[in-house]
Regions:
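Juxtamembrane helix-loop-helix connectors linking adjacent transmembrane helices
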Residues: 54-113, 148-156, 204-211
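Transmembrane helix-loop-helix hairpins at the membrane interface
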Residues: 103-211
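Alpha-helical transmembrane segments and their membrane-interface exit regions
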Residues: 43-55, 101, 160-170
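N-terminal, membrane-interfacial amphipathic/helix-forming hydrophobic leader that caps
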Residues: 1-62, 78, 144-148, 155, ...
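Hydrophobic, aromatic-rich alpha-helical transmembrane segments
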Residues: 8-15, 35, 63-71, 98-103, ...
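Short juxtamembrane and helix-loop transition motifs at transmembrane-helix boundaries
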Residues: 1-8, 64, 88-100, 118-125, ...
Length: 211
């Protein structure tokens, strides 16, 4: 009991409160264009993670090979999804990321999102409240993040929330097993294959099946 209390004392405020701050910004930015809003929300996560940076110290060291294990886990997770659901993914992603150039989508999905989201949800929230809480809140986070694109499509919003919770659980497991860097690598690999590649190569699933 004392050990848990000591761990929590490293945080300037409870991470539930930090998530509510994010939710407030998500609501306040609902009416601005999607691309700008997503950048703002990623920045909010990065700022919150920096505020909590003291809590990231003392993490156990993981060998560099664990980054490869995280990327491999992402590959194993992402390829079946791409092969089975590529047409649906292309349509959904076009709705969730409207008007973004390929370069902007790559920067956001593959570089910024994995870093910002894993630092907060796995490096902070999961560390304080556990794997399940981190996964469930990640599903809610994605629903809020993409809300303008799903507000008229309840089933898409539900799918985003449930898929986010499932991905969050997997990223959380990778984090517990191989460390935060591996979780970031896993997340980046999934985003690259599942969310970015269908945007730039619409027929990629058909090509892969033909190999």
């Amino acid at each position: 009991m004392g050990k848990r209390q000591s761990r929590k004392s490293n945080y300037p405020l409870d991470t539930w409160v930090a998530f509510l701050l994010y939710a407030g910004v998500a609501a306040a930015t609902f009416t601005i264009d999607a691309a700008s809003r997503q950048v703002v929300l990623w920045c909010v996560l990065l700022v919150l993670s920096l505020v909590y940076r003291q809590a990231l110290r003392g993490e156990p060291a993981h060998p560099p090979a664990d980054l490869g294990r995280g990327a491999a886990a992402g590959l194993i997770l992402a390829l079946p999804i791409l092969l089975l659901l590529q047409p649906e993914l292309t349509a959904i992603i076009a709705r969730l990321l409207p008007g973004q150039s390929d370069a902007a989508a790559f920067q956001g999905l593959v570089l910024i999102a994995p870093l910002a989201e894993e630092l907060f949800f796995r490096g902070l929230l999961q560390k304080q409240h556990g794997l399940v809480a981190g996964a469930l809140l990640y599903g809610v986070y994605l629903l809020l993040f993409f809300l303008p694109g799903v507000v008229d499509f309840a089933l898409v919003g539900l799918a985003v929330c449930l898929a986010g919770a499932l991905f969050g659980f997997i990223y959380g497991y990778v984090n517990e097993r191989y460390g935060l860097g591996a979780a970031i690598a896993c997340h980046a690999t999934v985003n690259l294959i599942v969310f970015f590649m269908p945007l730039v190569v619409p027929d990629i699933a058909r090509w892969l099946k033909a190999i």
